[in-house]
Regions:
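N-terminal single-pass transmembrane signal-anchor helix
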Residues: 2-30, 34
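Extracellular/periplasmic head regions of type IV pilus-like filament subunits
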Residues: 54-138
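Short, surface-exposed interaction loops/tails
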Residues: 128-160
């Protein structure tokens, strides 16, 4: 009797099942890596905003005014104006002739991570009329170093 060449149905099913399992594990690991990368970027963005705000504070003697209620600072410019001081702070377009501290406040990376609101853009608020303190609200899908996941805030005292 001649021996047939090839694989049996059972052998093929076992190989397909193993490939499927390995693919699933790779996708899960990749999604976790992407979430960690987005969160690391969020922390870096907030630190850059804090640096720009401190430079602004050193020059102006106070932090810039809050943006409109319900708005975010993402996509705006942080600058001063030499001709119209009231136009200093977060504006839609950088003021020509002024000092630019941050040409464009970054947008939070997408997609939104679990446990965060539908909009996770960075929201800046000056906490008092004297301009001595502020809050930047942001959200993390997972802990980054010592910073726990969830809704977080940054102030002149640091990131929490």
């Amino acid at each position: 009797m001649k021996k047939q060449k090839g694989f049996t149905l059972i052998e093929l099913l076992v190989v397909i099942a193993i490939i499927g399992l390995l693919s699933t594990l790779a996708v899960v690991a990749l999604n976790n890596a992407r979430m960690k990368a987005r969160d690391a970027r969020r922390v870096t963005d907030v630190k850059q905003m804090q640096t720009a705000l401190e430079l602004y504070y050193n020059d102006a003697g106070k932090y810039p005014a809050s943006v409109a209620t319900g708005s975010t600072t993402s996509g705006t410019c942080l600058s001063t104006s030499s001709t119209t001081p009231e136009a200093s702070g977060f504006t839609a377009v950088c003021n020509p002739g002024g000092v630019i501290y941050m040409a464009m406040v970054p947008f939070s990376p997408t997609p939104v991570d679990a446990g965060c609101a539908t909009s996770t853009d960075y929201a800046y608020t000056r906490d008092d009329d004297n301009g001595t303190t502020y809050t930047i609200n942001y959200c993390l899908g997972a802990a980054v170093g010592e910073i726990p996941k969830g809704s977080r805030r940054a102030t002149p005292a640091g990131i929490r």
